[in-house]
Amino acid sequence: MTIHAHALLFDNDGTLVSSLASVERCWTRWAREYGVSAEDFAGIALHGRTAVEIVGDLLPADRVAEAVARVERLEVDDVADGGVELLPGTRDLLDALPADRWAVVTSATHRLAAARLDAVGIRPKALVTADEVTRGKPHPEPYLLAARQLGVDPARCVVFEDAPAGLAAGRAAGMTTVALATTHRAEELDADLVVSDLSALSVQVTAGGIEISVRG
């Protein structure tokens, strides 16, 4: 299978990098500090959601802003302690792309996303974070904004995601979707193509755009 595109849009956590251990470590500490019970915390989905949404599910509205700032500090500080690592295939795939043909689209704040990306040497020309949008994934706004930043028709963009909410955002934006089974089982992911991770793919830049193929 070969997919043709003009731009590639990547989620970050679970797609380009792994930060799951850091997320669990920092949020568990945060929950203890804010008196969130283990039962309440266990019932909340963390992956693929903004901190504002998560905290809003757990604390009164008047405590959200301060609590979000606290968990952001915890997560940013954890980056220096090895809280992020590249996932297989990330470096080779990004190195094969022109800088103006790809973007990172994440539910993290700009400060946290920049820290994680910088830690592994990824410096996208276009970066869309929770701070740049009013509605996060699964709403299409983040991916539509990335397409505008790159000057590419959404219909010619391909979204790479590991989370159902992100894949839903890509579909709603009218984009082709590629799911990576890094944090969810393949059968849980609704996408045009499902692969294990980015190492399963190869890209070739042509005069007409970018060709994405499954290796082997």
Q: Which residues does each predicted region cover?
A:
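Intrinsic disorder/low-complexity segments enriched in polar/charged and small flexible residues
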Residues: 29-32, 104, 200
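Aromatic/pi-system hotspot detector in well-structured domains
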Residues: 27, 102, 160
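N-terminal helical cap/lid subdomain that shapes the substrate entry/recognition surface
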Residues: 2-98, 109-111
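A generic secondary-structure micro-motif detector
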Residues: 17, 41, 83, 103, ...
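Hydrophobic residues in well-ordered beta-strands that form the structural core
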Residues: 18, 104-106, 179
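Short, flexible loop segments at the rims of nucleotide/cofactor-binding pockets, characterized by
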Residues: 79-84, 105, 135, 172-173
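Asp-based, Mg2+/Mn2+-dependent phosphohydrolase catalytic module
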Residues: 1-5, 91, 95, 99, ...
